[in-house]
Amino acid sequence: MAFKDLFKFNKGKTTFVFIGGKGGVGKTTISAATALWMARSGKKTLVISTDPAHSLSDSLEREIGHTPTKITENLYAVEIDPEVAMEEYQAKLQEQAAMNPGMGLDMLQDQMDMASMSPGIDEAAAFDQFLRYMTTDEYDIVIFDTAPTGHTLRLLSFPEIMDSWVGKMIKIRRQIGSMAKAFKNILPFMGDEEEEDRALQDMEATKKQINAAREVMSDPERTSFKMVVIPEEMSIYESERAMKALEKYSIHADGVIVNQVLPEESDCEFCNARRKLQQERLKQIREKFSDKVVAEVPLLKKEAKGIETLEKIAEQLYGEPEPE
């Protein structure tokens, strides 16, 4: 199967692709190249960097913001800004607190502590942005340029963590609501029933959104993970561990892209020695990931940045784009 044939599209529904791997293997290069190829093929495409390092703007040589920025025809890009995400998430918490005048942020924090194992607010803020894009059908395809493997696996585990946490929060909120009704006559600051109901509805809507994201993420017809590796042992072993973790989260990993493969060079003894070692590692990769489609991208003579260079990489990986 050709690597480009791994991408599946359902009319009216967004396809989601995660591109991940060890730090330094070229995830951003592959993400940007893939996004450009999809856009040239006529797909309305969004590429999102979830990596705080934010090298997507450097790769595309464009200024990219926290909200979708148009890069070329059909192509939009986002670099999630952790500080802005945190501000937006804290604003949501403030709004929840305002639902009940008797419950300030301190009491809201008490609720979070009571729920036990509440996720870190920075991670929850990042996940809040992630949810926003996982539950959209505005684009034909959304490509996630992910952080190094460990951070990505944590993010992908968040639907399960947040679903459990929000479920506990709903339970506690209902208990508080019952107490408020019981003591309302003597404790008027507990807030009215309409405010309580609205706060509960917000939590239930969040839980519904999380469940929708979980359903999409575990659907191989809509979501897939492409692993980027380089032909070195450390990268191979980390990718193998990541593949096993992805199975745990029911995320379909179907492709492996081997980046930075050395070309043949008969006049360079050092290059030939490195190439020989790489060929051994390539054989290892094909054996370990025999159930995946494996593609190779050669090491370039210059830096892999700029739209023209990225389009050439995409053509090596996927062939000429075929506009719809």
Curated annotation (Swiss-Prot):
Pfam families: ArsA_ATPase. This is Putative arsenical pump-driving ATPase. InterPro entries: Anion-transp_ATPase-like_dom, ATPase_ArsA/GET3, P-loop_NTPase. Its EC number is 7.3.2.7. Anion-transporting ATPase. Catalyzes the extrusion of arsenite. GO terms for molecular function: ATP binding; ATP hydrolysis activity; ATPase-coupled arsenite transmembrane transporter activity. It is an enzyme of class 7 (translocase). NCBIfam families: GET3_arsA_TRC40 (TIGR00345). ATP binds at residues 21-28. It catalyses: arsenite(in) + ATP + H2O = arsenite(out) + ADP + phosphate + H(+). Keywords: Arsenical resistance, ATP-binding, Nucleotide-binding, Translocase. Belongs to the arsA ATPase family.
